[in-house]
Amino acid sequence: MLKIFNTKFIRSAPVVAAVWLSLTAGIIIEFNRFFPDLLFHPMS
């Protein structure tokens, strides 16, 4: 199992970028689910 993570494909830039963007999107979605109005502040 650890041999899979040591290959060059998993460490390549598109895979790392896809994992990073998915993680960031998940964090933003969950934050917006628990605190719905904190991401978009009104201009008042």
Swiss-Prot record:
InterPro entries: PSI_PsaJ, PSI_PsaJ_sf. It is found in: Cellular thylakoid membrane. GO terms for cellular component: photosystem I; plasma membrane-derived thylakoid membrane. It is a single-pass membrane protein. It comes from the Bacteria. Pfam families: PSI_PsaJ. The chain crosses the membrane at residues 9-29. Keywords: Membrane, Photosynthesis, Photosystem I, Thylakoid, Transmembrane, Transmembrane helix. GO terms for biological process: photosynthesis. SUPFAM superfamilies: Subunit IX of photosystem I reaction centre, PsaJ. May help in the organization of the PsaE and PsaF subunits. Belongs to the PsaJ family. This is Photosystem I reaction center subunit IX. The lineage of its organism: Bacteria, Bacillati, Cyanobacteriota, Cyanophyceae, Synechococcales.
